[in-house]
């Protein structure tokens, strides 16, 4: 079917990209995080994957994004970028993913709305000050794993669940925070593999591809050293042992910023997580609309941030 509105979304995406790139070059961003990304890109390129996690430097990211930063480091070394050009280059992967998220919103919206409304919805994201500040000015990379989470949800909602296994694997390989979206994948498996047209062949096929996604993660981890990667995940998951770190959530509202976790508050945090998952189960299976995957995803992200402990800005 011909898309009569294609030119509008292309122009919107191009303008949003250029705007982000310019702002990304003008503003360095969050000094600590940008120093990490720049330092990591140089370190992983100069020392290689195998030595990266053994270097005497701070690193709290899994290997997934290190592959991206390796390319960034190679380009930076080749062209000798510095200052604004360097800032823009480091932010470029997140900027590209930000734009792709907007395009994906357009694609999903077109299934229910007109071309014009779909373009408007995509533009609301592409020109949302919060996403621009987060990505281009602040220099954060949330849009990278957000893109893969949305692709996972998209493939599940389109009954192409096999692709979702690989999207989720890549996402976990980029940021372990993606684990909070595990219930969505489980819901998709229950609904698309077990409830609808269940068969032994279908189960084995999905099991095979699920294992393949895990094998993909293992293969990508090998250059870094399996033990190094496992240590990195366990260290990252155990970091920020506080009720909240500069996060505007329930604990921040109670004045608990940077307050260490006690045995009691740790239990409370787990209770909240169980309650969040239980509520997402209720909402998912009560809804008959296929958009429930997106809604439950938003619900999990919002409620986890607002109620869980160890959240940070």
Which role fits each region the language model picked out?
Residues 11-15, 197-224:
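Hydrophobic alpha-helical membrane-interfacial segments at the cytosolic entry of transmembrane helices
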Residues 88-112, 272-285:
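Transmembrane-helix motifs of polytopic, lipid-linked glycan transferases
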Residues 33-60, 64, 71-81, 226-232:
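Extracytosolic helix-loop segments that constitute the early lumenal/periplasmic catalytic or substrate-binding loops
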Residues 104-107, 144-161:
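Specific aromatic-rich, kink-prone transmembrane helix
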